[in-house]
Swiss-Prot record:
Gene3D superfamilies with a match to the protein in the record: Aconitase, domain 3 (3.30.499.10)
UniProt-listed HAMAP family: LeuC_type1
Cofactor(s) the protein needs: [4Fe-4S] cluster
Protein name: 3-isopropylmalate dehydratase large subunit
NCBIfam families named in the record: leuC, PRK05478.1, PRK12466.1
Catalysed reactions, semicolon-separated: (2R,3S)-3-isopropylmalate = (2S)-2-isopropylmalate
Pathway, per record: Amino-acid biosynthesis; L-leucine biosynthesis; L-leucine from 3-methyl-2-oxobutanoate: step 2/4
Length: 473
């Protein structure tokens, strides 16, 4: 097993005891909750006459079901209104801080935690959402959990888990223009597979990772689960510290920053740390990556041919055939020129301010293609305000994009933003499963934000490197 890694250090520091079944009971430093996975858990503890153990270490928001076009209450969707009302009641009764739309701090849970400064290195963080691994970008151990585990954390502020192995993914090389963090993680998943990380936590390291901004690191850690890993993380460094120092929490508590920084530095993986596996990726060889199929692992470079199913591993042949039939693609073709109907720029993977800035540089002075629905959904109200102050909203709207309010939106079919029929969508989100965006016949092509912008302008999957970027004022 691994030794001397950040994962080992933080795990051991938070271990309360080892249970008879061999699992470790861990103290949870931050519990993030939202409206979809928490109601049943609250109901369970109420039935037992229990209270929330640590409301001060619990933070709530609404993101999955919240409409992005019109957020006036009551919501037009009765189910969404019911979930929102239940969450409001539960957090009020328990005294839990709630970033709801009236606060100006609402947004996707994996966007608001970091931007408010409550996501910190060395914390154990859980949330009833599979993309909780996003917070690992800060050197936290962050895990998605199910309803029964949410119940346990609400009641005890602890969780029972099995310790995983650690795989170091060393990424080197300078990224080509138009290639982003999203392309790195799509390539990792393509190479290792959607089940390649089962039993592992991924440590992302190497000069390429170190040169990424925090938003890029979050994009990579966000999709660890798509690669089968239980979590993913990056060792904290000066980029991390500079980002955190500007957040509300540390602006209000500067003494805490100075107090915690030595601890953050101490949890970094040792130079001689031992890993269970090491994988090397040369990111300098990457082109923009897009998916051709119905799993995030079915990706190719924009210039590469769609594979022949028979050339894949035996257990992937039938899946590839079904995916190609659903997506209406043929082996040997490239994805460049694939017609799209919708362009979605949003999600907890790619809806932060730098994502929107990069996309705006492609969009500025251009127009969305005829017959394409294109919209931008900022990851949080803070991102939304900042983007509007910078003039990004105007750039997108002048090009023909819809500018929406913060929420999960079309990343998943749980709100009003959904594909219709067999529409094809260029999406900056994290999953392209059949039916993921609301229609069982819908087709999703995952790509980085600038590639989404390029697809919106051209009406087809295009190589963003062929479009000149415009300098923003």
């Amino acid at each position: 097993m691994s030794q001397g890694t950040l994962y080992d250090k933080v795990w051991d520091q938070h271990k309360v005891t080892t249970l008879p079944n061999g699992q470790d009971q861990l103290f949870v430093g931050l519990h993030l909750i939202h409206e979809v996975t928490s109601p049943q858990a609250f109901g369970m503890i109420k039935e037992r006459g229990l209270e929330v153990a640590r409301p001060d270490l619990t933070h709530a928001t609404v993101d999955h079901i919240v409409p992005t076009a019109n957020q006036d209450r009551p919501y037009s969707d009765d189910a969404a209104e019911t979930m929102m009302a239940e969450l409001e009641e539960n957090v009020r009764d328990a005294g839990i801080q709630f970033s709801d739309p009236t606060t100006g701090d609402q947004g996707i849970v994996h966007v608001i935690g970091p931007e408010q400064g409550i996501t910190q290195p060395g914390k154990t963080i859980v949330c009833g959402d599979s993309h909780t691994s996003t917070h690992g970008a800060f050197g936290a151990l962050a895990f998605g959990i199910g309803t029964s585990q949410i119940r346990d954390v609400l009641a005890t502020q602890t969780i029972a888990m099995e310790k995983q192995k650690v795989r170091k993914i060393e990424v080197t090389g300078e990224l080509d223009e138009g290639v982003e963090a999203k392309d790195i993680i799509l390539e990792i998943i393509r190479r290792l597979g959607t089940e390649g990380g089962v039993g592992y936590v991924y440590e992302y390291a190497g000069e390429t990772i170190e040169n990424l901004d925090m938003e890029g690191r979050m994009s990579i850690c966000n999709m660890s689960i798509e690669g089968g890993a239980r979590a993913g993380y990056v060792n904290p460094d000066e980029t991390t510290y500079e980002w955190l120092e500007e957040t509300d929490y540390f602006q209000e508590h500067p003494e805490k920053f100075e107090e915690l920084k030595p601890y953050w530095e101490s949890i970094r993986s040792d130079e001689d740390a031992e890993y269970d596996d090491v994988v090397e990726i040369d990111a300098g060889e990457l082109d923009p990556v897009v998916t051709w199929g119905t799993t995030p692992g079915q990706g190719i470079g924009i210039d590469d041919p769609i594979p022949e199913p028979e050339d894949l591993a035996d257990d992937k042949v039938d899946t590839a055939r079904r995916a190609q039939k659903h997506m209406r693609v043929e082996p040997g073709e490239t994805m460049e020129g694939y017609d799209i109907d919708v362009a979605f720029l949003g999600s907890c993977t790619n809806a932060r301010l730098p994502d929107l800035r990069r996309a705006a540089r492609i969009v500025k002075g251009r127009e969305v293609a005829d017959d394409v629905r294109a919209f931008v959904v900022p990851g949080s109200q803070r991102v939304q305000r900042a983007a509007e102050e910078e003039g990004l909203k105007d750039i997108f709207e002048e090009a023909g994009f819809e500018w929406r309010n913060a929420g999960c939106s079309m990343c998943l079919g749980m709100n009003e933003d959904q594909l219709e029929g067999d529409e094809a969508c260029a999406s900056s989100s994290n999953r392209n499963f059949v039916g993921r965006q609301g229609s069982k016949d819908g087709r999703t092509v995952l790509m980085n934000p600038r590639m989404v912008a390029a697809a919106a302008i051209t009406g087809e999957v295009s190589d963003v490197r062929d479009l000149k970027e415009v300098t923003l004022a």
